[in-house]
UniProtKB/Swiss-Prot annotation:
Region span, Disordered: 1-22
Residue ranges with Basic and acidic residues bias: 1-10
SUBUNIT field: Binds to the N-terminal domain of the chaperone ClpA.
Functional note: Involved in the modulation of the specificity of the ClpAP-mediated ATP-dependent protein degradation.
One GO term (biological process): proteolysis
Domain of life from the UniProt record: Bacteria
Lineage summary: Bacteria, Pseudomonadati, Pseudomonadota, Gammaproteobacteria, Lysobacterales
Organism in which the protein naturally occurs: Xylella fastidiosa (strain 9a5c)
The protein, known as: ATP-dependent Clp protease adapter protein ClpS
Family label: Belongs to the ClpS family.
InterPro entries per record: ClpS (IPR022935), ClpS_core (IPR003769), Ribosomal_bL12_C/ClpS-like (IPR014719)
Amino acid sequence: MSQKTVHDQDNALLLETGNTKVAPPPRYQVLLLNDDYTPMDFVIVVLQQFFAMDLKKATQVMLHVHTRGCGVCGFYTREVAESKVAQVNEFSRIHQHPLLCTMKQA
């Protein structure tokens, strides 16, 4: 809501409120990048665990990543995208896989 300052005849401060539209926050794509070492089953687990995909959808995304080199896991606000990227990269590192997750503005 925008506010406009106005003074009345006694020089008292008055506020006029108007209707303004607030733009939605920018969305970010969370992406998985293909590598030659991470097992396909591990990628499916990541997609199910961190992106709430069922087995069929996770398999489709995994195959897309495998054949195209990159795949979209979802669209999120910046903070959520950053959190998911960090969680996936940490999970991959702990399990000694080079799977890389990244994000870019949609």
